[in-house]
Structures are given as structure tokens and as C-alpha cells.
Amino acid sequence: CYAGLYKRREGGLLMASKIVLSGYYGFNNLGDEAVLYSILRTLRTSKPDLKITVLSGDPAQTKKLYNVEAVNRWKLQEVFKALRQCDLLISGGGSLLQDVTSSTSLVYYLGVVWLAKLLKKKVIYYAQGIGPITSWVGQKLVPLVSNKVDVITVRDQESKNLLQKLEVKIPAIYVKADPVLGLYNREIERKSGQDLL
């Protein structure tokens, strides 16, 4: 499981008390909100006293829905403050590192990671779906930034292959299930258990 992986890493979840989550959150996208819910559930199950801050397009809504701290992802001063005060940045899940829909979004997510590393914070890619990455800029920036990340998990072998093709080689890359799939599987297990009663 994800929590077990991070606990085994020095300076990872076991050591972190303040975590920042970066993803496509606060835009009323059902899939991405399910990803956020699943990540929060995993983190809180592993360590209930975590202080979690989400970078969100709608901080007020995110605070209300998930009982977390949230800051406006577009306000650099707020993002900087959240990263400066955290122990760990989790980037993901979802398909954040791609430039098909927009190269701007790729630069944004990599920029958040880059800023966290400048502040000497631990960074995890969480169940990322990588690619397509077609632009010259994207193909240069992804390995430049990703080789500074502490732990990388991707949701499929294709994503791992692409990172390796782009020469991301410093952190180990783990293939793990999409967190939403894990949430779905737990729900099936719960219902199956009820049916047996």
C-alpha cells in the first residue's frame, strides 16, 4: 500500500507532520475530487494527526468538503507559505504531468515541485499518470525536476516507461494502482462483507 511505502522511506510519511497536496483540486472535477478523497483517507488512516493543506482552485469549498486547510493555488505567496511550513509535498494523483491539454499546467505542477525542493522539502509523486509529453520544453523539464523528487509512484507501467525514456533515473519508480481504484476496491470489499452477514 502507499502508506507502507512512504513509511519505509526516511523522511517520508513517518516523519512528516505537515503535508501539502498539489493536484487538480477545487475545480468540481469528479475524478480528481475522488483522487483527493482517497489520498486524504489513506493519509489519515496512517497518521490521524497530520496537518494537511491542499492547493485548490476553490479553497473555501475544499476546506468545507474535506476538513483540511486550503490555499489558493494561483496565489504564489500563499503557495510559498504553505510549502515553507510543510515537511512533505505530495504531487498527484491524476494525469498532472502531460502537455496535451496544456503545457501551462505541466509547467505549473513542475514549478510547485521545484519550489518545494528549493525549500529543501521532501516530495512524492503519488499515483501519477505520466504523459503524453510532446513538447521540447516538457521533455526537458520533466526529467530536470523529477530527478530531484524523493519517491515516485505511477499508476501504470506505461507511465514508468515514459519517465525512464525521459531519463528519470535518480528516485526509484514504483507502479501502484490508481488511488481511486483502491477506493473502489475497498468499497466492494465492504459491501461483500455486508452481504456475507
List where the protein language model places each region.
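Active-site anion-handling motifs in enzyme catalytic cores
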Residues: 1-3, 9-197
